[in-house]
Amino acid sequence: MENDIYSKQLQQKRLDDAGDFPKVVLVDTVSMCNLRCSMCFHQNMKRKKGIMPWDLYTKIIDEIAVENKDARVWLVFFGDPFVIKRTKPNIFEEIAYAKNKGLTDAVLNTNANLMDEEVSHRLIEAGLDAIYIGLDAFNAETYVKLRVGGDYQKVVANVLGLLRLKKELTSNKPGVYVQFVVMDENEKEVDDYKRFWSEQGAIVKIRPKVSWAGMIDAPKQILDNKDRWPCHWAMQTLSITDTGDVVLCPCDLDARFVAGNVRKSTLKEVWNGKLKELRTLHLTGQYEKLPEMCRICRDWQSARSDYYSLNPL
C-alpha cells in the first residue's frame, strides 16, 4: 500500500517543489456552503465566512496571468461557488475575467445542488475549463446521509443536464468530473458509480477521505507518520482565503497558520517566504520542525485520486 501511493505520487511529479510560483492556486471566492457534509469540516469552521471582494480577486488573477497562466486555478476553496451565482460580482463574471486574462485551467468544485440549466449555460459561455461535482454515492439513501441537506435526484439531473447541454452546443468544455470520496458508508457503491457515470460521459474521480489536518476522523489513513514523504499540497499549492490570507495548505479550513496576505504582498513573495521554508523542511525530511498542524497531519497520504473515463483522459 505504502509503495503504491508513494510511487504514484512520484510518477505524477506531485512531490516536486513547484519552484518560484505555485502550480495550483486555490482562491476562496466564497467561503459559505449550502450543505453539511460528513466528510467535510466546513460545518465546524470557526473563521468568519464571506465573499472575496472584486478588487482582491482581480489582483490575484492578474498576477497569476503574468507569472504562470497555465497554473490550475480553483475559483472556490471552502464554499460552494453557486452561493454567489446572483451576487455582484458573481462566479460567472469571475470565471470570464480569469479566462479573458489568458488563464488556461480555471476550475470549480461544487455539490451541484444550486445548479440548473441557466447555470450550465453560463458556465459554458464563461469558458470554464473543468467542474468537479461532489456526488459520493450511487444510491439516494447513502447520499443524504453523507451530504446532509442535499437532494440526490436534483444533483443527478443537474449533472446529466450539463453533459447534455455540452453535446447540444458541441462544446468540449467544461470537463465534467464526478467525485466520489470513499468511506465505509459508500465503498460498496464504487463499481456501480464508475460504470454509470462513465457511460454518461463524465470523468469519474475516486479519492480517499482526508482528515482536514486532524479535524475529523479518516480511518483509511493507515500509514504512520514515521513513513511519511513530502506533502503534495505543500509542494505545489497556494491556498488563499476570501480575506487574502495565505494558509498552510488546502486542509487548513480555519486558517490556523497564516503565511502572509496577498493584499499586502504578491503571491510570489508569499510563496517564496514562510511557505518555501516549510517546503524545504518537507524535502529534507525534517518533519519534526514543521508547525504542529502539519507535523501531526496524515493527509499527505491522501493527496491522490484515481480517474476513470470511457474516453482517453
Predicted region positions:
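N-terminal pre-core extensions flanking Radical SAM catalytic domains
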Residues: M1-G50, D62, E67, D245, ...
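Nucleotide-sugar-dependent
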Residues: W229
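Conserved glycine-rich "GG(E/T)P / GGGxP" loop and the immediately following alpha-helix
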Residues: G19-M215
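Short, small/polar residue-rich loop motifs at catalytic or cofactor-binding pockets
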Residues: H232-A234
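Short, charged low-complexity intrinsically disordered segments located at boundaries
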Residues: E94-A98, N186-F196, N225-K226, C294-N311
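C-terminal accessory region of radical SAM enzymes
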Residues: R164-Y177, W197-K226, D245-R304
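Short, acidic, Ser/Thr-enriched surface-loop or helix-capping motifs
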Residues: I240-T243
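Short, surface-exposed beta-strand/loop micro-motifs that present aromatic residues
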Residues: Q236-L238
